[in-house]
Amino acid sequence: MTLGVVSFLTDVSSEAVTAILPLYVTAALGLSVVAYGVVDGLVQGAGALVRVAGGWASDRTDRPKWVAAVGYGLSALTRVGLLFAAGLPAIASLVVTDRVGKGVRTAPRDALIAASANPRNLGRSFGVHRALDTAGAALGPLLAFVALWAIPDGYTTVFVISLGAAVLGVGALVLLVPDLRPRQAAWLRTHRSRESRGLPKCKGCTCEAPGGLQLTGRPFSWGFLRRGATVRILVVAGLLGLLTVGDGFVYLALQDRDGFATQWFPLLYVGTNAVYMLLAAPVGRFADRFGRARVLVWGHVLLAAAYACAAAPFTGATTTVVALVLLGAFYAATDGVLSALTSALVPADVRGTAIGTAQTVTAVARMAASAGFGVLWYAAGRVDALWIATAALVVAVPVCAFLLRRSPA
């Protein structure tokens, strides 16, 4: 729950900026949709490679809290830079740095959630966390909307709000989140189980030596990547990620079609995140009961439907609201569920690295998807680009469902 509060504050900070980024790049800076595609690609994938590094550092040190703290702190520092940045190169550099911070913190944070949760309820635990996380993601754009409504072109005000929330998030992590040691806890469970059954100590036991607990746990190994179930998860995550374009494109398409005022633009993020917040926990429980792999894959049908709504010729609030509901439901069915699914397939001593690897594959794929979709929009137009993305998802979902048909989680 405390980690949820940290994520709530951090998402207020990050999503307040994300909500105005499409307009800031295309309207305030006067750049093209291709340039926004590059920036959105950086948002999606700049921290991708360090997600594995963050997970690896978490597993090696057995200190996920402090590895996560580095990532949260790095993102907070970029909020200061936003107050002084001008032009695309500076904005892009800060976006990259912020995403690196997110990449460093995400896998250790999810490893902490998995370490503190009942293994049978991983989906629910991640769902509750994502609900709090998404509450912040809804409040951030709402604050951005209020700021832009009160002060037209008041982007600096949004950046100040973002900085304050980021500082509070780092403080909550450092002061309130327990310093869990997942590898040590897993070893202790095994050791005590053997003792309770009258069995000898496990091979290589060092618990009675000075500093013995710090030496516990199996040597780190990348062997989990050779397991068939893990490989299939990574393949599916990459394939579906390649067909997931940034939300900003969907929102720009809705605005382009309906022509509503720019001040209302951040509320599109609020709508999506409000639906995600309401559905994250119940969908997580549903995934625990009926299969996380099934929910992950078939959740992308909702994304295809959202693209179709944005491409449809029907104007007005109804199709916009339906598109936002579908997007929010898609994230509820996929975001935390991927981490829960990966956590259930690997041992505790490599859990952070495994989660980071899955998230890296997804992030790199989405980075390529956003950059490619920007070019496709420019070449083929908004409507055709969205219909192509819809058709590709309709084909890919059954293929991915077949690949994960025997998933143990």
Where are the language model's segments positioned?
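Cytoplasmic helix-loop-helix junction between adjacent transmembrane helices
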Residues: 94-135
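Transmembrane alpha-helix termini and helix-breaking/packing motifs in multi-pass membrane transporters
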Residues: 23-28, 139-157, 368-384
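Structural signature of the two symmetry-related core transmembrane helices
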Residues: 66-80, 163, 294-309, 390
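Juxtamembrane intracellular "pre-TM" segments in multi-pass secondary transporters
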Residues: 1, 179-239
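Helix-to-loop junctions at the C-terminal end of transmembrane segments
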Residues: 50-63, 148, 279-292, 377-378
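C-terminal membrane-cytosol helix-exit motif in multi-pass small-molecule transporters
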Residues: 164-191, 396-404
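C-terminal transmembrane helical hairpin of 12-TM major facilitator-type secondary transporters
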Residues: 293-338
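Helix-loop boundary and gating motifs at the non-cytosolic
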Residues: 1-47, 230-268
